[in-house]
């Protein structure tokens, strides 16, 4: 685990990220807050590409909690069969759809606590939704960000929570909204787990 980089160095890193990609975007396809929530929940232990392949047809017929409930668990399961843990995920999506319909007026809540009260929604999923849909500077730490935080010293920590805290403490405020996307994309395409592409690295 690398030592925590100083503030000027972290600022310079994110300045470079911003220059290279001013408006980074998440790669999960969605059309509203509900489809984003479902896509992120389905993405655990799966690739974004795999989730997108399954959800294109799904979201064409079920892009709201009410429509998901009409679709039903059996049909949902068929749509997401190619995604890992699809049976458990289907049950969770149906449960969270019912809760959203009955307790939240069919709307996705904008608080972390409310999001995490939904079945199958942990802190990382809640943070992604808060960041991507509600534009809150939440840092969703996935395997890529955990690796980069520790490998580079941008946000070292022994746990996901520690890395998230380090990001919140050390990423300059003007970069906080997009920080998690820059780091995910950097980890996905450059600072990969095996044989990182160091000659192409902005850092």
Question: What are the residue ranges of the model-derived segments?
Answer:
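Catalytic cores of DNA base-excision repair glycosylases
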Residues: 2-203
